[in-house]
């Protein structure tokens, strides 16, 4: 789905940027706190499984008939010293067609932010 649609490129760049910003800030904060609760290096490899974002023009003209927007990513978390996979959570988030229509596409455009926030919260809940 991702590779077959060249229109996804811009959305991939946006998602990567937001995800990198949120996780980099989180990990930097943990490093600067001096906490030795965990040691070692965690490798985070996000893999986009599906991305479909209805554009603002389409959403305004067609409304809910344009369908829903959705993002599905896998986050493979690997211990760098052992190479063992620690976890591989899947994050799925969608913006319903009616929500997109009523918000004039705002819920579609915010989907990248929602997914990055869920990923950040996953680390806070499981690795702090």
Each PLM stretch: what is its role?
Residues 8-20, 64, 68, 105-116:
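Solvent-exposed, acidic/flexible segments
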Residues 1-21, 25, 54, 88-92, ...:
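A structural "domain/chain start" motif
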Residues 29-85, 95-106:
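Surface-exposed short loop/turn segments
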């Amino acid at each position: 789905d991702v590779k077959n649609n060249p229109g996804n490129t811009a959305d991939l760049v946006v998602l990567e940027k937001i995800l990198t910003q949120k996780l980099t800030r989180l990990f930097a904060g943990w490093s600067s706190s001096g906490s030795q609760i965990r040691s070692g290096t965690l490798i985070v490899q996000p893999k986009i499984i599906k991305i479909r974002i209805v554009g603002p023009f389409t959403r305004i003209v067609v409304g809910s008939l344009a369908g829903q927007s959705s993002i599905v990513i896998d986050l493979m978390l690997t211990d760098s010293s052992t190479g063992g996979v620690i976890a591989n959570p899947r994050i799925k988030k969608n913006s319903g067609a009616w929500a997109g229509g009523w918000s004039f596409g705002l819920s579609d455009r915010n989907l990248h932010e929602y997914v990055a926030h869920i990923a950040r919260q996953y680390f806070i809940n499981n690795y702090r």
